Amino acid sequence: MTSISNVSKGSIIRFKGEPHIIESLIHRTPGNLRAFYQANMKNLKTGRNVEFRFSASESVDVIVTERKPYQYLYKDGTDFVMMDSGTFDQINVPEITLGTSSRFLKDGITVVIVFSDDGSILDVEMPTFVEVEVTETSPTTKDDRATSGTKPAIVETGAEVGVPMFIQTGSIIRVDTRTGEYIERVKK
């Protein structure tokens, strides 16, 4: 157990018996009241966001974790098969662990898997940005390229992304895996 004041963003704690990652932690001292920490956390089992107020003197159970890089190989049913780059061991990661960012997984991409002290998978950290090829989008006319609207595009992983009108089939784009938003076109 450690004091809440020693915990920072990105720490994984055991809260109400389940692992939670701290997404933000703010120390507050309002007027005549006692100080507290306002924490926004994400439950790593269910994916739900939780807000909680910890008193400044409260202790929490920090989970000892290990982060290891793994390479994505293929999808097997509802699991993703990942390979340890050093030992070549393969593990299956349930789709629910990756969440919505799994729609941008493509062969050979490197992810970081977070293991708890008992060896179970707590989280999978995707790269923030991935480069994917647009496989299908509606053709544009000269008038469309002059406007600043967006259109739907299907990328090589099967995900749909809103892209600017000038993007055509075969273009390579950079996408934010956290939000699924188009960032920029990549020069070939």
From Swiss-Prot:
Keywords: Cytoplasm, Elongation factor, Protein biosynthesis. SMART domains: EFP (SM01185), Elong-fact-P_C (SM00841). It is found in: Cytoplasm. CDD domains: S1_EF-P_repeat_1 (cd04470), S1_EF-P_repeat_2 (cd05794). The keyword Protein biosynthesis applies. PROSITE patterns: EFP (PS01275). The keyword Protein biosynthesis applies. GO terms for molecular function: translation elongation factor activity. Pfam families: EFP, EFP_N, Elong-fact-P_C. One of its GO terms (biological process) is peptide biosynthetic process. InterPro entries: Elong-fact-P_C, NA-bd_OB-fold, Rib_uL2_dom2, Transl_elong_fac_P/YeiP, Transl_elong_KOW-like, Transl_elong_P/YeiP_cen, Transl_elong_P/YeiP_CS, Transl_elongation_fac_P. It comes from the Bacteria. Pathway: Protein biosynthesis; polypeptide chain elongation. GO terms for cellular component: cytoplasm. Belongs to the elongation factor P family. Involved in peptide bond synthesis. Stimulates efficient translation and peptide-bond synthesis on native or reconstituted 70S ribosomes in vitro. Probably functions indirectly by altering the affinity of the ribosome for aminoacyl-tRNA, thus increasing their reactivity as acceptors for peptidyl transferase. This is Elongation factor P. It comes from Chlorobium phaeobacteroides (strain DSM 266 / SMG 266 / 2430). The gene is efp.
